[in-house]
Amino acid sequence: MIKTELNYGDVYLVPKKTVVDSRKECDTSVQFGPRRFAMPVYPSNMKSVVSAETCELFAREGWFYTLHRFNVDAVAFTRYMQEQGLFASISVGVNDDTYEQLDALKAAGLSPEYMTLDIANAWCVKAERMIKHIKQHFPNTFLIGGNVATAEAARDLEAWGCDAIKAGIAGGRVCITKNKTGFHRPMVSTVRDCVAAVTIPVIADGGIVEHGDIAKALVCGATMVMAGSLFAGYDESAGDIVEIAGKHYKEYFGSASQFNKGAYVNVEGKKILVEYKGSMGKLLRELQEDLQSSVSYAGGTTLAALREVEMIQVYR
């Protein structure tokens, strides 16, 4: 029998009695690894979304971030961030160049506070080898592994040594994996299954369309939420500005796109133009205000209240 699964657009949250006088009383901070952050959402570690400058901005604002892994000097970035009194959070792959990158970090006496193993399907033998290698050589680094889409995969990544996992395959706006391969799982079902399977934090990665989807992901049990298109198109975002018929746009492309790879090989991503939106400051304020409202509707004062909210399916 074919299973029916759910995405964020298929569900809503049932309001509870509000116990605060003002939404501003609601605390949106989250403990993630060794640090506490202002919000449980952060930009995708994509070359068209974050740059080193974007990451520094988020760190200074008290938000989590992860730098992408494409043509990055991890040694220079880690050293710079730590010299600034900020935390370093980098991404790595599973191929030979990553082992060389890790050797360079170790030779420099550097250990990033956070590291994300970032590949399309982390439920594989190469990821297992890399996770065990990282935990052996960087035991004090908080290691995030991704991406996965099933309970069994999540359990394996925890067993291999990950401190958190990233859940979601082919849910992003510029990801065409589901079109090219037929493989994908809706995010509500993915996150709930992965959360139930492990004892470590789960990051819901992909499928965020509206601000309210962040609250839905947290209700599903996610500790953190990663979003790409939500953070694209701003001054502080990566990507080039393009002018068409007097309007300004920024390029936004997937990590598996031809534009990121530099060649049309195993392409599972595309490039789109998103409207240029100016400064990101307004977005960060709105995201926090909207999540404070979500917490108030959940009948609490902290993000923990969202774990007790009823989720209902809507038929369209």
From Swiss-Prot:
Q: Which family does it belong to?
A: Belongs to the IMPDH/GMPR family. GuaC type 2 subfamily.
The UniProt entry, under NCBIfam families, shows: PRK05458.1 (NF003966)
Q: Name the chemical reaction catalysed here.
A: IMP + NH4(+) + NADP(+) = GMP + NADPH + 2 H(+)
Domain of life the protein comes from? Bacteria
Protein role: Catalyzes the irreversible NADPH-dependent deamination of GMP to IMP. It functions in the conversion of nucleobase, nucleoside and nucleotide derivatives of G to A nucleotides, and in maintaining the intracellular balance of A and G nucleotides.
Q: Report TM segments.
A: none
Is Oxidoreductase found in the keyword set? yes
Which Gene Ontology cellular-component terms appear in the entry? cytosol; GMP reductase complex
One of the GO BP terms on file? purine nucleotide metabolic process
Catalytic site: 175 (thioimidate intermediate)
| Entry EC number(s) | 1.7.1.7
Mind telling me which CDD domains this protein's record contains?
Answer: IMPDH
**Sorted UniProt keywords:** NADP, Oxidoreductase
Q: What is an example of a GO molecular function annotated in this UniProt entry?
A: GMP reductase activity
Record's protein name: GMP reductase
Q: Which residues bind NADP(+)?
A: 202-225
